[in-house]
Every structure is written in structure tokens, then in C-alpha cells.
Amino acid sequence: MNNSKKNNRKETNNASSRVSISWYPGHMAKTMKQLETDLKLVDVVVEILDARIPVSSQNPEAQKLIKNKKKIVVLNKSDLANEIENKKWLKYFEEKQIPAILCNSNNGEGANKIINKLNEMMSEEKNIAQQKGRNKIVRAMIIGIPNVGKSSFINRVSKKTSMRVGNKPGVTKNKQWIRLTSNVELLDTPGVLWPKIANEQTALNLAYTGTIKSDIIDEVEIAYNLVKFLIEKYRKNLIETVSYTHLT
């Protein structure tokens, strides 16, 4: 995330114990190298973020690679996030001149906006190609950390369900091109983290949202931190949801 002082949004900090995560399977290291190579094949990067944790779900290593590319942000799983916060994040990216859309991959709401966004972003290049009698194919790369819903998003936008989708981090491991229209193509890439997640709050947020495999984290500690956070910030909602009357 761009750390400029102006309008630098942050997620709620509720870390109360030292938590850091190191989970970097061999295929992720290879993916980062391949991503750097494949960037030469595309015009635009479509970055899928978890709308609940937009900052934490950005891979800082990937940001270094794509910094000179045009980018569109998809705030996925928007139905699971706070509606007011969703609007604030859209404004945040807008002020940074980064096109952003909200998407609910469960029902497809918002997914169809991506094609128009891609065409708008590449309109100048398309016009130049048209003047030369050529049809410009807009090629975009989908990137995102594990479990942000990249495959579900692509299934919605391509109206297909053939892509293997799962709720476990790291399901997609092979590179795939998907044709959306006669002049828009997407290159899907596997989800990849960075070698060491040292920031305590980032580690917790990724654990809360299922990005980190459960066998490499202390589930009891993560659960304790999450419940503590919910009690502090959403006490009334928690009571109504789980009927924990002893919390009153």
C-alpha cells in the first residue's frame, strides 16, 4: 500500500500479542519469479484484495514488481465487509488515481465492471491501434494473495465454473489465460505471499480471514485475539449473533 502521508488509511489495530508468520512454499518463490517475467506480456494488473483487510491483503513484494504498470484494484468479498468502510476504501484508491471496484464473488455483483474498466484504461492505446487498422487486445494479469477469491472472481467475470475453486489457501497453482471478450484477456496467477509477515496486525488479519493454513499458526492464540477484538469493537453484534449473554 502506498504509504504517503496524505489520506493514509489503516485497518483497525487489535494486536495484543507477538504474532508473526513465515509461510513461503517453494511454488510461491517460483511464482514471484514467473510473475516478474509475465508482467512483460500484459498491459494492466488487476489486483484482487480482500475488502475486509485491503492493506493486509496487499503483497509488498508484488507491489515492487508492478509499480510501473497500470493497475485496477478489486475489493473482493465486499459483502463480508462493512459497507461504510467499503465506500471509504473506494474513495481512498480514487484519490490515489487507482481505479477500484467492489465485488461480491458469491453473486457476481460488481464483477462485470472489470471489462469496462480495462477498456477505459486502455482507450488511448486502443484508439492508436484502430487508426493503424489493428485491433488492440487488452491483456491483464490477475494477482492476489491466497484465499482472496481470485478464482471465484474470474469464474464470475468469465461466466464459467470450470476453474478449480477452493476455500484453502494456494488452490490455483498453474498459469491460465482466460478470454473475456474478443479483445480482453486475463492471465491468472497463483496466490502468493511474501517470505516473512513480520507486522503483527497483518499476520492476525491474514489468519482471521483464512489466508494462512491452520497447521502453521497457533489457532488458540488467533481465536483469543479475534474474540477480544470482536468484544471490544462489535460487542452488541457479537451478543446478538452468538447469544453470549454472559458478555453483557
Question: Where would I find each of the regions flagged by the language model?
Answer:
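Anionic group-transfer/hydrolysis microenvironments
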Residues: 49-52, 78, 93, 157, ...
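Short coil/loop residues immediately preceding or within conserved phosphate-binding loops
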Residues: 137, 160, 175
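Canonical P-loop GTPase G-domain recognition
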Residues: 82-139
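Glycine-rich phosphate-binding P-loop
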Residues: 140-159
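G-domain G4 guanine-recognition motif of GTPases
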Residues: 48-51, 74-82, 103-109, 209
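Helix-rich effector regions associated with P-loop NTPase G domains
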Residues: 2-45, 52-61, 65-71, 84, ...
